Amino acid sequence: MKRDLYETLGVARNADEKELKSAFRKLAMQYHPDRNPGDQEAEKSFKEINQAYETLKDPQKRAAYDRYGHAAFEQGGMGAGFGNGFAGGSAGGTSRHFRRHLRRDDGRRSSAPLLGRSRTRCGPSLQHGDHPRGGLFRQDGADPRADVGHLRRLHGLGREAGHQPEDLRHLPGLRPYPRRPGLLLDRTHLPDLRRSRSDDHRSLQQMPWPGPGHRGAHAVGQYSDRHRGRHAYPPLRRGRTGLRGGPPGDLYIFLSVRPHEFYQRDGADLYCSVPISMTTATLGGKFDVTTLDGTKSRVTVPEGTQAGKQFRLKGKGMHGRALQPDGRPLYPDPDRDAAEAHQAPARIAAGVRADLVQGEQSAIDGLLLPHERFLRYTERIATPGFRLCPSP
């Protein structure tokens, strides 16, 4: 398989003329036959470098290569619009005939001529599991964030390891041109569909369909995967490269917030459950809640507070440009930890009150242990360097 011309020169696909010339001069001096007498490999590399530079420095040849790859310069290939393979025929008239028998890369019939005036197409949006053929590679309505699975093993080779590419020109849907006597089309042929586009991993790849067990039919589509990194927002024009020289698509990022061990989020509001003792719920008292910034806010519990009672701390919730300037509220929810659910009495006798105070101080019944664990947690998250959402 022929080597990618950009890879041969060691430049990016969007390299300008100055970068191409600089890379060519550097490699030409390195592999020049005069500097490597008798070295056949150096001579071969020198010829490849010259061929790559001669192709890419010409705007028309470069555009044809970007669209069709090496097939643009082969006899009867997609680049035959430059005059090869038609024996004086009109590329425009021939393209109208091609249009009736070929489909676009996304499975729909093309409204633009295939040769000569091929229109560009915006690249597909880079979503996990998204392909130009839509329902061909996944069921309609499926979550685009679902794993691609089998497609991960292809790595742009167009086939699984250990399997040779197959001749696909006889398959249904890949209709060759009708061979009618007297037509110039007899002198043309489809591009070699046996060739997997490993020379251009960024756009076209051949992938098995309908599944891992069927290696007979292939189709041209896009392959996407998950990537982790920092991205500017909004992430526009960061998708796959467009087909036939078109602009790149958009990049869509799906965000999911991992659950926190203490806070529960509902929009911009935060909720948390705070364990308190039966004595505090019955007699009243106070407890501290650690907020997102590590500071503590004291909540006063009135006498006779029942389980599930919500308290509101104004301005202690989420902050952001789209939220209120002082933040949204934080709702501590007292959760009395006891062996059995019970209600705190609204009124209590003086003697019982004294017994409860004594039990609060001694903690014989162990009801204070959950609250003590909560206090230790709040002290831990208030220490410098603690992160509420540690990196995975």
Swiss-Prot record:
Q: Name one Pfam family in it.
A: DnaJ
Q: Name one GO molecular function term.
A: unfolded protein binding
The region called Disordered is annotated at 103-142, 157-244
SMART domains hit by this protein: DnaJ
Give an example GO cellular component term for this record.
Answer: cytoplasm
| Keywords recorded for this protein, A-Z | Chaperone, Nodulation
Q: Where is the J domain?
A: 2-71
Q: List all disulphide bridges recorded for this chain.
A: none
Biased amino acid composition, Basic residues: 227-241
Which GO BP terms apply? chaperone cofactor-dependent protein refolding; protein refolding
Segments of skewed composition (Low complexity): 171-185
List, as start-end ranges, the regions of compositional bias called Basic and acidic residues. Answer: 157-170, 186-203
Asked if Chaperone is a keyword of the record, the answer is yes
Superkingdom assignment: Bacteria
| Name of the molecule in the record | Protein NolC
What is the organism lineage in this UniProt record?
Answer: Bacteria, Pseudomonadati, Pseudomonadota, Alphaproteobacteria, Hyphomicrobiales
Q: Name the gene that codes for it.
A: nolC
